[in-house]
């Protein structure tokens, strides 16, 4: 959608920290100021891979929720997606959640990605795939800001042109009801996600990760993999 006069607003991604050491230092310094003393950032939950496996992974996947940890911690959906991904040889998985609203300013002030891997303390730009789990349509209102404030461009063409940006895919119970994410925002400017996975994750998501691994191994670009 264009503004009055046909001027396209600038929607540039935020400049975020990419150095894990700097993010860890921020975390150690400010954890007590986070909601619930940062319980939503602790990571290392049961069945989560240890960070020691990060370096040897051939494909790194961040499973991201559009709701807060408090709201979805008991959900089985992202845990199942993570388990499916872990079963693909060479894949490392971490999880990220919508931060509690009162933590936004603290994270933005220091350039910490709003989507932050709870175990790795890495933002989406450190991963190969950003897998967004969408349960209900209302959650999608959080998507543009979470992308931008995590350093991820909104437009597919820019994401495809930058090797440091992960493939952005969306799945989940609501994935078949996401027409708002499809099509072009302006001529030549596809919007928000690179692909939507519809169907049983046990089959579709596993196969997607296998295709990405194969493509990476052959030196294909993200666009060629898609």
What residues fall within each predicted segment?
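Helix-enriched interaction subdomains in cytosolic or periplasmic regions
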Residues: 1-39, 88
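SAM-dependent nucleic-acid methyltransferase catalytic core
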Residues: 36, 40-46, 63-64, 87, ...
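Histidine-anchored nucleotide/phosphate-binding helix
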Residues: 46-52, 75-87
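Residues that mark the start of a beta-strand
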Residues: 58-63, 67, 92
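A short, glycine/small-residue-rich beta-strand->loop->alpha-helix junction that serves as a flexible
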Residues: 68-76
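Glycine-rich beta-alpha loop elements in corrinoid/cobalamin-binding modules
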Residues: 100, 111-226
């Amino acid at each position: 959608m264009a503004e009055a006069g046909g001027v396209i607003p600038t929607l540039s991604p935020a400049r975020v920290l990419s150095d894990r050491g700097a993010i860890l230092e921020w975390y150690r310094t400010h954890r007590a100021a986070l909601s619930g003393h940062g319980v939503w950032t602790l990571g290392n939950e049961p069945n989560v891979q240890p960070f020691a496996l990060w370096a040897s992974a051939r494909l790194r996947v961040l499973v991201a929720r559009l709701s807060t940890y408090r709201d979805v911690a008991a959900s089985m959906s992202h845990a199942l997606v993570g388990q499916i991904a872990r079963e693909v040889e060479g894949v490392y998985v971490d999880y990220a959640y919508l931060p509690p609203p009162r933590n936004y300013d603290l994270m933005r002030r220091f350039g910490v990605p709003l989507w932050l891997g709870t175990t790795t303390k890495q933002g989406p730009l450190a991963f190969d795939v950003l897998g967004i789990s969408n349960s209900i349509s209302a959650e999608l209102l959080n998507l543009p800001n979470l992308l931008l404030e995590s350093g991820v461009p909104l437009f597919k063409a820019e994401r495809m042109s930058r090797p440091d940006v992960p493939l952005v895919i969306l799945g989940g119970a609501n994935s078949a009801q996401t027409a708002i994410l499809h099509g072009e925002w302006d001529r030549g400017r596809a919007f928000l996600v690179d692909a939507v996975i519809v169907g049983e994750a046990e089959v579709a998501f596993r196969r997607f990760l296998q295709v990405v691994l194969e493509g990476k191994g052959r030196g294909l670009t993200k666009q060629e993999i898609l």
